[in-house]
Swiss-Prot record:
Stated name of the protein: Elongation factor Tu
Cell compartments where the protein resides: Cytoplasm
Highest taxon above the source species: Bacteria
Function: GTP hydrolase that promotes the GTP-dependent binding of aminoacyl-tRNA to the A-site of ribosomes during protein biosynthesis.
Gene source species: Fibrobacter succinogenes (strain ATCC 19169 / S85)
Catalytic activity: GTP + H2O = GDP + phosphate + H(+)
Listed EC numbers: 3.6.5.3
Gene: tuf1
Length: 394
């Protein structure tokens, strides 16, 4: 069967369900698909189709995630759901499935639980801009006061982690009842989708952001000059644009005198394109893999930062033993490894495989860096962890 043509008429948004184990994330995902399918806006998915999540690899880490897609009146959504708690942590820290917003599922029967808190904290750390709340299992609670109490707790928790707890939409419903076709609860799912449409901001398109391209390779064309190749991460680059070479040394400005893709000359190239950029005045020795080319003054080089990291378990191919303060692995940013020293938070003696922790890092060379930049932690060429920059120090 031929693949369906991707409809670009509606703006696209990436979303995901987060929340404590057994609070109904996967049931809600199935209920959204089923409810929207009845209106011709999605393909119906059974619970077990979503629950049997395929394995994916991101930054050397295996993660189980299910992807479903659906449309609302205004948008096209790609929705990610993870079966296990560890998969969520890994997914959010590695940015395997980027989230422009999240649906936090909280069971009214339990209220906020430890993983509810952890997922909200992680969402804040990795830069998820907005959260919409679905209070699930409301059909199992007879006392309206309990529902009000749970709602209050959730709002307080969101505010604690810098989300707008007072104005966050909280929809009360039952994912299971909606999945079983109860019209009252299907309406609640539609209410949730409207809240997502209205409250979760559309992401800025990559092409609207300032230009950045990590350098993968460099070579010389006799008589023409030096060419840097790579995949454009964001923005647009045009002939005669000025760009800065940043990282692993002094920042230098060049002018683009040629843009080439698949051996064809172009006037410009944009996010997602694999290109060669001819740089006026550059010498091959000046440019190495791991540097970036970027719009002037759009990003700066740094060596010291804080990060939220996940440390792989032995079964995931990670370390067999904990690491202590002063551990010196390689940090793999974009296209290269840079050695750095890890300082652990006060009171933390060591970090055990499987832990999530906030660390302070000093790199031996500067890297073009900004908040939410993802990286892998490697030791002798194998991945032992992954993380996201949460704060730049210098």
């Amino acid at each position: 069967m031929a693949k369906e043509h991707f409809d670009r008429s509606k703006p696209h948004c990436n979303i995901g369900t987060i929340g404590h184990v057994d609070h109904g994330k996967t049931t809600l995902t199935a209920a959204i698909c089923t409810t929207l399918a009845a209106k011709g806006l999605a393909a119906a998915k059974r619970f077990d189709e979503i629950d049997n999540a395929p394995e994916e690899k991101a930054r050397g880490i295996t993660i189980n995630t299910s992807h479903v897609e659906y449309t609302t009146a205004n948008r096209h959504y790609a929705h990610v759901d993870c079966p296990g708690h560890a998969d969520y942590v890994k997914n959010m820290v590695t940015g395997a499935a980027q989230m422009d917003g999240a649906i936090l599922v909280v069971a009214a029967t339990d209220g906020p639980m430890p993983q509810t808190r952890e997922h909200i904290l992680l969402a804040h750390q990795v830069g998820v801009p907005k959260i919409v709340v679905f209070m699930n299992k409301c059909d199992m609670v007879d006392d309206a006061e309990i529902l009000d109490l749970v709602e209050m707790e959730v709002r307080e928790l969101l505010s604690k982690y810098d989300f707008d707890g007072d104005n966050t939409p909280i929809i009360r419903g039952s994912a299971l009842k909606a999945l079983e076709g109860d019209p009252e609860y299907q309406d609640k799912v539609m209410e949730l989708m409207n809240a997502c449409d209205e409250y979760i901001p559309l992401p800025q398109r990559d092409t609207d952001k300032p230009f950045l391209m990590p350098i993968e390779d460099v070579f010389t064309i006799t008589g023409r000059g030096t060419v840097a190749t790579g995949r454009i991460e964001r923005g647009v680059v045009r002939l005669n644009d000025k760009v800065e070479r940043i990282g692993l040394g002094e920042t230098t400005e060049y002018v683009i005198t040629g843009v080439e893709m698949f051996r064809k000359l172009l006037d410009d190239a944009q996010a997602g394109d694999n290109v060669g950029l001819l740089l006026r005045g550059a010498e091959k020795k000046d440019i190495v893999r791991g540097m970036v080319l970027a719009a002037p003054k759009s990003v700066t080089p740094h060596t010291e930062f804080k990060a939220e990291i996940y440390v792989l378990t032995k079964d995931e191919g990670g370390r067999h033993t904990p690491f202590m303060n002063g551990y010196r692995p390689q940090f793999y940013f974009r296209t290269t490894d840079v050695t750095g020293t890890i300082q652990l938070p006060e009171g933390v003696e060591m970090v055990t495989p499987g832990d999530t922790v906030t660390i302070h890092v000093n790199l031996i060379a500067p890297i073009a860096m900004e908040k939410q930049l993802r990286f892998a932690i490697r030791e002798g060429g194998r991945t032992v962890g992954a993380g996201s920059v949460t704060e730049i120090i210098k």
